[in-house]
């Protein structure tokens, strides 16, 4: 969601986009020009300059939201933020609130309004010959186009067709939630255009007509999402004058429309989709379809406080701008440097100077094409019934969006084609004409109301049939869902059976393979067993032969045993003899050994005696030698 500050011309740049009280995005550049744009740009000095040299005229500052004149005690008081739109909360106004007429400057304001209207008629006359579509879209400046009232939201309905206009598609206001109140007729003044009350809950009575002023026809805001509602036909008119931006006089209401002298096709805001509804076909305009703006959400605030007009006062431009700006409008009036923006300056001068009177001269207005306008209005009323409810105007929404479509011919300001007559104009229409137009509009509103009621009953019946169709569709969907579930279950079972079959086939194939292997092994074992049987027979024969041989060898063994026993007996006898001989020899040897030992012992004794004798002899010899040496 994006918030945009309105490009208000009566508030300087430093107060509109850079003020601490307005935390919004700076104003965007658009293709549409507003009233007094040139004069205001000349009057407001740029921020870079320290002092403005010449200021032609300065209007009092206005609140960017309500366009009210700011008095000295109101400069620091900002009211509720800009009117944004949301699906759930909207700005509601009082039920029985009536537009307030200007208090002091009514004649002056009338003259200013006539000047603006004359200028618009002049531009329309200039552009009529060049473009037929432009002339058809500018017919509303001559006659009052009745406001298109939105249709009350029925409680339980189905589709919501939105039939848009064929020639010029105005912005559509959101249809608010229904209430149990009655819409009262609002007869707007010829000069001051107050806001139109929002649509409240649907009343149990008939809808009352709402007539706009001769200069301004309020637009229709986009249709919001109905919460728990069904079919809601929103039928728009074929010829709707786009909103005019600047406001001539302040009023005591929350939202005020903005008047614009140059006719520019306003952007169409998107139609939101309903939350609990069916399809909503939108038939676009056939000729001109302006760019679509995103829908903004309103802040959750109540109604703006009603400001007393007594507190409003005119402020000097030097107090507002903080520079020594001089008002030299009267000095430049009538000179050669009087530019074509003086039309707007003179209109402001006429508005704020009660001493200036009407001029006997008036510009030549373009002849109004009343018959074609009424015919087109009748065709639009008979061919495409409009909504029968009054909707809330949102002139403070996002209007500063670049226009993607080519600029209309009628939006271009003609240069050098301004008449030389004085600007001040007298009233063109009398009160009787206004009353006649009001009566015509009331009759048209009654016809539209009856058509709406017929369409509403048809749509209610259609909603019932659609509900039955939805029930049947739900039942068929449930049955289809059940069938689908059963089909899925059957498919699952089939898949399981197929898997089991594949498994059994695989098992069977493996069993066949194993059986073939087993049979081959059986054949091999059979051959082996046959070989074993042959071997057994041959072995049995060999065992019989071996038994015969063993018996023969046993007999031989017995014979050898007897022979060996005899040989052993003989050998034992010989051994006994040898033993006896050996013992006798051992005894003889032992005796000889004893004898040898005795001899050896005796020899050892004699050796010892000899050694002793030798020792004594050697001692004696030593003694003798020693004695001999001494001698």
Curated annotation (Swiss-Prot):
Organism: Mus musculus
Function in brief: Plays a role in the microtubule-dependent coupling of the nucleus and the centrosome. Involved in the processes that regulate centrosome-mediated interkinetic nuclear migration (INM) of neural progenitors. Acts as a component of the TACC3/ch-TOG/clathrin complex proposed to contribute to stabilization of kinetochore fibers of the mitotic spindle by acting as inter-microtubule bridge. The TACC3/ch-TOG/clathrin complex is required for the maintenance of kinetochore fiber tension. May be involved in the control of cell growth and differentiation. May have a role in embryonic development.
Family membership: Belongs to the TACC family.
Name of the protein in its database record: Transforming acidic coiled-coil-containing protein 3
CC annotations in GO: centrosome; cytoplasm; cytosol; glutamatergic synapse; postsynaptic density; spindle pole
Pfam families: TACC_C
Coiled coil start-end: 431-630
Intracellular or extracellular location(s): Cytoplasm; Cytoplasm, Cytoskeleton, Microtubule organizing center, Centrosome; Cytoplasm, Cytoskeleton, Spindle pole
Region (Necessary but not sufficient for spindle localization): 311-366, 384-631
Tissue expression pattern: Embryonically expressed.
Residues bearing the modification Phosphoserine: 39, 71, 347
Molecular function terms from GO: protein domain specific binding
Modified residues (N-acetylserine): 2
Location of the region described as Disordered in the Swiss-Prot/TrEMBL record: 42-70, 363-385
Keywords, in A-Z order: Acetylation, Cell cycle, Cell division, Coiled coil, Cytoplasm, Cytoskeleton, Mitosis, Phosphoprotein
Compositional bias of kind Polar residues: 42-59
InterPro entries the record matches: TACC, TACC_C
One GO BP annotation of this record: mitotic spindle organization
Self-association state and partner proteins as the record states: Interacts with GCN5L2 and PCAF. The coiled coil C-terminal region interacts with AH receptor nuclear translocator protein (ARNT) and ARNT2. Interacts with CCDC100/CEP120. Interacts with CKAP5 independently of clathrin. Interacts with CKAP5 and clathrin forming the TACC3/ch-TOG/clathrin complex located at spindle inter-microtubules bridges; TACC3 (phosphorylated at Ser-347 by AURKA) and CLTC are proposed to form a composite microtubule interaction surface.
């Amino acid at each position: 969601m994006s918030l945009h500050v309105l490009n208000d011309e009566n508030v300087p740049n430093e107060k509109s986009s850079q003020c601490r009280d307005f935390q919004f995005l700076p104003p965007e550049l658009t293709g549409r020009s507003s009233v007094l744009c040139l004069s205001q740009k000349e009057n407001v000095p740029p921020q870079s300059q320290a002092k403005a040299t010449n200021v032609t005229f300065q209007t009092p500052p206005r609140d960017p939201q309500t366009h009210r004149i700011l008095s000295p005690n109101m400069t620091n008081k900002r009211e509720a933020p800009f009117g944004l739109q949301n699906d759930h909360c909207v700005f509601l106004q009082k039920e029985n609130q009536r537009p307030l007429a200007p208090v002091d400057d009514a004649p002056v304001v009338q003259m200013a309004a006539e000047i603006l209207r004359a200028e618009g008629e002049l531009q329309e006359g200039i552009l009529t010959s060049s473009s037929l579509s432009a002339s058809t879209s500018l017919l509303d400046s001559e006659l009052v186009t009745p406001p298109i009232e939105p249709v009350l939201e029925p409680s339980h309905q189905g589709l919501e067709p939105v039939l848009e206009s064929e020639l010029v598609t105005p912005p559509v206001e959101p249809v608010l939630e229904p209430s149990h109140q009655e819409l009262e007729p609002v007869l707007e003044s010829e000069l001051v255009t107050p806001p139109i009350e929002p649509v409240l809950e649907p009343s149990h009575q008939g809808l009352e007509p709402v007539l706009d002023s001769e200069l301004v026809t309020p637009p229709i805001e986009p249709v919001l999402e109905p919460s728990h509602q069904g079919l809601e036909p929103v039928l728009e008119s074929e010829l709707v004058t786009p909103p005019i931006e600047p406001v001539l006089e302040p009023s005591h209401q929350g939202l005020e429309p903005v008047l614009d002298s140059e006719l520019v096709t306003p952007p169409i805001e998107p139609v939101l989709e309903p939350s609990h509804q069916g399809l909503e076909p939108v038939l676009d305009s056939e000729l001109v379809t302006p760019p679509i703006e995103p829908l903004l959400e309103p802040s959750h605030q109540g109604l703006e406080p009603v400001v007393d007009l007594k507190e409003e006062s005119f402020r000097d431009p030097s107090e507002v701008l903080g520079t020594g700006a001089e008002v030299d409008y009267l000095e430049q009036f009538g000179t050669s440097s009087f530019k074509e923006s003086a039309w707007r300056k003179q209109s402001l001068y006429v508005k704020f100077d009660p001493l200036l009177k009407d001029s006997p001269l008036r510009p030549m207005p373009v002849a109004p094409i009343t018959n074609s306008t009424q015919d087109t209005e009748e065709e639009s009323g008979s061919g495409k019934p409009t909504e029968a409810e009054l909707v809330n105007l949102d002139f403070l929404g996002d209007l500063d969006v670049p226009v993607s479509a080519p600029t209309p011919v009628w939006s271009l300001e003609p240069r050098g084609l301004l008449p030389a007559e004085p600007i001040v104009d007298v009233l063109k229409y009398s009160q009787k004409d206004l009353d006649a137009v009001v009566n015509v509009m009331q009759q048209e509103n009654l016809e539209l109301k009856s058509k709406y009621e017929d369409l509403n009953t048809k749509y209610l019946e259609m909603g019932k049939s659609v509900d039955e169709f939805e029930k049947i569709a739900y039942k068929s969907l449930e049955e289809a869902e059940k069938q689908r579930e059963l089909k899925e279950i059957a498919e699952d079972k089939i898949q399981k059976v197929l898997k089991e079959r594949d498994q059994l086939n695989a098992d069977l194939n493996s069993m066949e393979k194993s059986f073939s292997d087993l049979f081959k092994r059986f054949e091999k074992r059979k051959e082996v067993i046959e070989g074993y049987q042959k071997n057994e027979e041959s072995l049995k024969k060999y065992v019989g032969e071996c038994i015969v041989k063993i018996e023969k060898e046993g007999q031989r063994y017995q014979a050898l045993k007897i022979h060996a026993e005899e040989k052993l007996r003989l050998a034992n006898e010989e051994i006994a003899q040898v033993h006896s001989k050996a013992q006798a020899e051992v005894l003889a040897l032992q005796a000889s050994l004893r004898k040898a030992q005795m001899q050896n012992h005796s020899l050892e004794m004699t050796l010892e005696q000899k050694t002793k004798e030798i020792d004594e002899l050697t001692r004696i010899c030593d003694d003798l030698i020693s004695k001999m040496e001494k001698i």
